[in-house]
Every structure is written in structure tokens, then in C-alpha cells.
């Protein structure tokens, strides 16, 4: 559980991250290098009172977005690709953790937008069920069912895949192979009891993703939220998230 003062520090870290995101959405274009985006973020974070990144940033364009912990950040961003950026500023020893996936040329293709909106739908659904009393394992199973439905709508899994799946390795895990949420605070992966029910004033990330290796497309979205008795506060709620908001900010 986080004290009010801790949540204030986390909000400040998220606000600095917002400044960085707003800067790079105007900067990204075909031909830029991933590490140039990293440099722009670093400058904006430091300018706003952060000591830098809260963790090693992931700036992954094209097929590299399907590598979950890609940290080379050394490739050219190409026209037509989507770039996945998992980044966050530190402030006062507290971490923020954000992921956005944006079109290098400022405009999603229809397929990219369809996948993006499926991830967004799961993200919003996950935020809606992460409440005091739920166990993280139960929560992730519910999120898995949401993801299964979205993958069916995208034509990535069908009923046959679902009927024959191993319960220990559901069909959706081919395209969404990581957890949905983790504690965040002094550490980006903060200490917390995952076998105990979620409590009020816990702070979690919410970060579903869909990774389609055969299409060279990986999309993840992530915000940090504070859990309340009857809802949540999205610490990153003012950062562009909808596909149209991303495109508008880039253009």
C-alpha cells in the first residue's frame, strides 16, 4: 500500500513522462534512429527535474517490438512500421512505467489500428476489474479471456485453437505471453505479495500487448493506476492513448 506522499511522487514521475511523450510524438518520423528517440526522452526528463529513466528504455521499431526486452535501440525507424516504446521517468526515487506504440509515419494502417484498438479494449477491461479483493492470478485469467476474444476478432485464433488448447498454456499466449500488471513504486517492479488480494492504495501497471511475429507487428499499451475502494485513478490519464489522439499529436 502506498501513502499519499508516495502517490504524489509517482504522479510527478508520470507527469514528467508525459512531457517526454509529448516531445517525441512531434519528433518521430521515418529515418530517425531508435537511440535518437531515447536521447530526446532523456533530455526532456532531465529538463523537468528527473534524474533520468526509471529503467532501461525499450525503443523497438518494426519486428523488434515482438522482442519483449529489446534494449539495443539502434535501428532506423522505417516508414510503415509501428514503434513500441516502453519508457518512464524517475522522480524522487519513484518510478513511472509507460508503454505507447505509435506509427513511424504518423498514420496507422487499418490492420495496425485494429490490433491497437484490441489491445486498448483489453487494457480498459483490465482496469475495470483490478479492484481490492481480487487475486492477481484470477485477474490475469479474466484478462486472458478478454484477450482471447480480441484475438478471435483479429483472425489470429479460432474456435478450433481454443477447443484444443492446453489449460496451462492457453491459445492466447502465442500472442500475449507476459503478465498484465505488476506493482510499481520505489522500483519499477516493486515489492508486493502477488498471492494476497489486491488492496486499496496499491499502485499497478496495466500493460496488455499483442505480438504478431509473422506480421512484424508488436503493440503494447501501459499506464500506471492507483487502486481505490470503488475504482481507480489513472496516473497517466492525460497522456495521449487513443489511436486518433496519437495520430493528432504526431501531425
Q: Where do the language-model regions lie?
A:
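Active-site neighborhoods and metal-handling regions in enzymes and metal-associated proteins
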Residues: 1-251
